[in-house]
Amino acid sequence: MHLSPQEKDKLLIVTAALLAERRLNRGLKLNHPEAVAWLSFLVLEGARDGKSVAELMQEGTTWLSRNQVMDGIPELVQEVQIEAVFPDGTKLVTLHDPIR
């Protein structure tokens, strides 16, 4: 199997997001890499499901709360940017202050 660097990056995000999901389900708080991976994964999946950039930017602020991440993480994650594939091409999605 031959994967491009972008495909490898997306697989790494998915792997980290699956770990984050398991930890959330166990009631554990996410650290910085886990929180970013989880948010990035939800953007990628939302784009795949046909949601618009605007919808994802709006929904992205509801996916994680301060109670689900370790102390100080909301201040560290002020912005998440991810390139996602939409039906009409690849677009950059930016989540501003996604952990509230």
UniProtKB/Swiss-Prot annotation:
Activity vs pH: Optimum pH is 8.6.
GO cellular-component term (any): cytoplasm
Gene Ontology molecular function: nickel cation binding; urease activity
Main location per the UniProt record: cytoplasm
Temperature-related properties: Optimum temperature is 45 degrees Celsius.
InterPro entries assigned to the protein according to its UniProt record, in alphabetical order: Urease_gamma (IPR012010), Urease_gamma/gamma-beta_su (IPR002026), Urease_gamma_sf (IPR036463), Urease_subunit (IPR050069)
Localization terms from the record: Cytoplasm
Cross-referenced CDD domains: Urease_gamma (cd00390)
Similarity comment: family membership: Belongs to the urease gamma subunit family.
Full protein name: Urease subunit gamma
Organism: Synechococcus sp. (strain WH7805)
